[in-house]
From Swiss-Prot:
Its membrane topology: Peripheral membrane protein
Family: Belongs to the ATPase epsilon chain family.
Name used for this protein in its record: ATP synthase epsilon chain
Known partners and oligomeric status: F-type ATPases have 2 components, CF(1) - the catalytic core - and CF(0) - the membrane proton channel. CF(1) has five subunits: alpha(3), beta(3), gamma(1), delta(1), epsilon(1). CF(0) has three main subunits: a, b and c.
One function term, GO molecular function aspect: proton-transporting ATP synthase activity, rotational mechanism
Keyword annotations from UniProtKB, A to Z: ATP synthesis, CF(1), Hydrogen ion transport, Ion transport, Membrane, Thylakoid, Transport
Function comment: Produces ATP from ADP in the presence of a proton gradient across the membrane.
Record-linked Pfam families: ATP-synt_DE (PF00401), ATP-synt_DE_N (PF02823)
GO cellular component, one term: proton-transporting ATP synthase complex
Length: 136
């Protein structure tokens, strides 16, 4: 018995296939989904979705959205997504370092739209970097 996983971004169908296990980055923490899981709807945080299929793990960087689990079908609707195997690890590392420096430079400043945007860029860069390093 397996799951059917669909990961849909606003501009593309990122993944559509079978999976033995899915780990979602929900806003309340990591959420493991196996065949027979109870139906649910959850918010997805910026992070890495992990998929186990045929004994191999694959990663997908997600940039926030929603996931629905119903009758062994997992549908993930996100703002942006990228397969870990298609991410340039060196470029992801550079983007992460730049975002870290930007956020560190704003330390101690009051909250502002610029500071929130910098924090979001850091979270997205971290997700892309993690997905690139855990890709099989």
């Amino acid at each position: 018995m397996s799951l059917t996983l669909r990961v849909l971004a606003t501009d593309q169908n990122v993944f559509d296939g079978s999976a033995d296990e899915v780990i979602l980055p929900s806003t309340t923490g990591q959420l493991g989904i196996l065949p027979g899981h109870i139906s649910l709807l959850t918010a997805i945080d910026i992070g890495v979705l992990r998929v186990r299929a045929n004994g191999a793990w694959n990663s997908i960087a997600l940039m926030g959205g929603f996931a629905e689990v119903d009758a062994d079908e997992v549908t993930v609707l996100v703002n942006k997504a990228e397969l870990g195997s298609s991410i340039d690890a060196a470029a992801a590392e550079t983007a992460f370092q730049k975002a870290t420096i930007m956020v560190a430079g704003m330390e101690g400043q009051p909250s502002s739209p610029e500071k929130l945007k910098a924090q979001q860029q850091l979270n997205e860069a971290r997700a892309r970097l993690q997905a690139s390093k855990t890709a099989d």
